A protein has these predicted regions:
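Hydrophobic alpha-helical connector segments
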Residues: 60, 71-103, 151-158, 182-185
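N-terminal intrinsically disordered/low-complexity leader segments
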Residues: 1-10, 21, 171, 200-213
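Hydrophobic alpha-helical segments that form the core
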Residues: 95, 149-171, 180-195
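Short coil/turn segments at alpha/beta junctions that flank glycine-rich nucleotide-binding fingerprints
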Residues: 25-29, 80, 101, 142
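Helix-turn-helix
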Residues: 10, 14, 22-56, 60
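All-alpha amphipathic helical-bundle segments outside canonical DNA-binding/catalytic cores
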Residues: 85-89, 120-126, 141-157, 179-183, ...
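Short secondary-structure transition hinges
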Residues: 96-137, 144, 152-153, 171
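Short, basic, alpha-helical segments at the C-terminal edge of helix-turn-helix-like DNA-binding modules
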Residues: 63-68
Length: 213
């Protein structure tokens, strides 16, 4: 890559990083292109050299950051660990994003997942759920997970729990420090995996037998 191309990419990244900070602080709809340019320390006109509009900036922020998460989650599925450990890794990846890049999480939760244009991105947003479903199905096939649960519903429940925790941190409803993130990982994963277990199925069947007896 030439020196000019490298400088251009660095400037583009500088603008995107600034946009994340501005969107996280002010919200997408109340932010102006000028706010992003000022945060990035570039001329207003230079921003339009890289992006045609504020909407394109947001779309790029989503596509690049979400893409990184999807790559990491897909890498987990491609491994040979037991399904329960794969689900644990997926939860850790998603929840620890809050510790590493909280502003990115704020933008993804507030400005992307709950925006009026969410239907335009639904295919990308549901990909983690599809991966989780695939992991659960493999766990059922191996006998690690109970066979009487719907993997599609179980995947939505698993991902939904993580999404609600992230939303709670974004909205300030819960503390999101290191200890709280670690506790959330244990709680979400251990509680749900206990419900997915074959032992839980056997216990449920025994209780139903007692009731019907």
């Amino acid at each position: 890559m030439s020196e000019r191309a490298t400088g251009s990419e660095e400037k583009r990244r500088q603008i995107l990083d600034a946009a994340v900070r501005v969107f996280a602080r002010k919200g997408f709809h109340t932010s102006r292109v000028g706010d992003i340019a000022e945060e990035a320390g570039v001329a207003h006109g230079l921003l339009y050299h890289y992006f045609s509009s504020k909407d394109e900036v947001l779309e790029t922020v989503f596509r690049e950051n979400w893409g990184v998460l999807l790559e990491r989650i897909n890498a987990v599925e491609d491994g040979d660990e037991p399904a329960s450990e794969q689900l644990r890794h997926v939860a850790v990846i998603l929840l620890r994003t809050w510790l590493h890049t909280p502003d990115v999480v704020r933008v993804l939760v507030r400005e992307i997942a709950r925006s009026p244009e969410v239907q335009d991105r639904i295919g990308e947003l549901v990909k983690p759920v599809e991966t989780i479903r695939s992991i659960i199905e493999r766990g059922q096939e191996s006998g690690e997970f109970r066979s009487d649960i719907d993997p599609a519903v179980a995947a939505v429940v698993f991902y939904g729990a993580i999404d609600e925790v992230l939303t709670g941190w974004v909205l300030g409803q819960m503390s999101g420090g290191d200890a709280e993130v670690a506790a959330a990982e244990r709680t979400v994963v251990d509680v749900l995996l206990a419900g997915f277990s074959v032992a839980a199925q056997e216990l449920g069947e025994a209780r139903r037998s007692d009731v019907s007896a």
